[in-house]
Amino acid sequence: MEERYLQLLAREYPNRQAALCEIANLTAMSSLPKGTEYFFSDLHGEYKGFSELMNGASGVIREKIRIQFQDVLTNPQQNQLANLIYDPVKVLSLMHEYGRDTNEWLKNTIFYLTQLCRGVSAKYSRVHVRSKIPHEYDYLMEELLYPGQDEGRLEYGSSIIEAVVSSGLADTFIPQFCKLIRSLTMDWIHIIGDIFDRGPRPDRIMEELIEYGDVDIQWGNHDISWMGAACGNRVLIANVVRMGISYNNFDCLEDGYGINLRPLSDFASEVYHDDLCECFLPKVLDENVYDKVAKSLSAKMHKAMAVIQLKLIGQMVHRHPEYHMEDRNLLEHIDYEKGLYKYNGITCPLTDTNFPTVDPKNPLELTQKEAQLMDVLAASFAHSEALQRHVRFLYSSGSMYLCMNGNLLFHGCIPMNEDGSFERVEVDGEKYAGRALLDRLERAAREAYFLPKDHPDKQKNVDKMWLLWCSAQSPLFGKSRMSAFERYFTKEKALHEEVYNSYYRLSADPHVCDQILKEFGVDPVHGHIINGHVPVRQKDGENPVKADGNLYVIDGGLSKAYQAKTGIAGYTLIFNSHYLALAQHHDYISHPLSKPESDEMPTLQITQKMDKRILVSDTDAGKKLSQRMDELRLLVKAYENGSIVERAIGSYPKTIQSLHMETMEIVR
């Protein structure tokens, strides 16, 4: 096997010199500082807010400007440069509006951008920087970034800037330079769950993540709901449509994903024509741009989907008694004559008793029109090219959890018992706990999407996606129940209560964090748990850093729906070669950029300084580089002892540089 592998490697590095050259390249790469990782959580469709955080690298760009130019630029000038990098088109427009975009200002701006870009690119190889430079300006930008020390070369750089401005290229050159700085500032992005629901455009967030590329995702329960809908789970199709309507997210459903809601609109208008559906009025946090729907009609559509979903949930509960979720089968616990809900010793009146499509003798049966409506919706989800492409990206870049560079990332919880032991959860007749549970559930989620339609295990795994969405034993949910439907139809507070899994209390204990980190093979001395799911009530004094610094909970309320609870507009955790830091964000969307020097920067707090600067060799990528170098050394020995014959580099079409870039993609 080793000889066969070396023969394959020899196709890429056809002689001893080529292999040694790559070993030298990778050795140099290993000695560079690690790139900066950014951790975001619970984006919930807030595309504009997320874009602001991405464009500003969560305040890191502003801090780099302060360090590099504090003796050169005034504070307003530093703000102006930062805002230009965040939103170059907007700032250039404002400068033009104020008559301040003189040639001198443009030349100075390009000069400062060049200086800053040299600073942020210093930790990367030229190959990496070159791969990020926009193609149309690759020659000009590379010449500016690597001028050399010769006086003539310095004058050459000035002449390039002069030529860019005098030829009228500045308005396109500057935005591309800003984009390069932004991309070099953020080496890797972690999304710790819940891209979808509540906010207006999760589809646009997905497009931005796909374009960025260097990203991983730890699935949240709201993500798994959309993934399940894309798999054909009808409970979850009803769920995402219901939730989308409840938050007035018609633009996402219809414009973003092309979901045909006209049959639902017609059905709801007919069935609930004389019902005000007051319990189902949508929460309007954002107005629709492309698909404006009257609140009265939205409420009817909302109720129609809620009732259909309740029927489908009841059917799911009957199909899978092993889920132990009988408390979700609400429609079979209603006394329709008296208008009462009865379950588990609790009897309470319903706030809404108009169920024109429910047969009290067979409450879980869909009417013919409801069944036809679900057929239309299922077809829309199955044939939505954008949705299916986004879900494939969620699968290819996502997982239930991730261990990377000494950190353990997951969205919700590791189910635990009160005594601190890992909860044993039954899946297909076998019990799993801890890491094994998450591995088993991830396998089920992948099989739900990728197994052929006629595979005998396909449907049971598709059904499990609902379990992952809202089961008390789901690591993505981690509450006793999801009481959304009790909130629709009852005022009984006891029925509204959702009790968190013991993990959420126990994980504040450093010893419990150590136990969890060890379970996942992460060093508890230097490792951290990073998760979201539960909004941190910062306004009430809650700290996102828990368990003596072992646990970071970074759901700070980027979602507008939670900002009243948290008091802020989200957190970003930043992990660079020097420290861990938390950026605390303000509501940038309510305070749009009005002048170039506006100061709407996040609060940056360093939470942990590293004992020594972290190098690439200290990271997971560094371990892969080391492994690659070991393989190349074996290849060199094979060339030296003659077991593999050397060839000229010209025998192969690929250059050493292109092979080096491929190697870097492998280790990333």
Regions inferred by a protein language model and the residue ranges of each:
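Feature recognizes metal-dependent phosphohydrolase scaffolds
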Residues: M1-R668
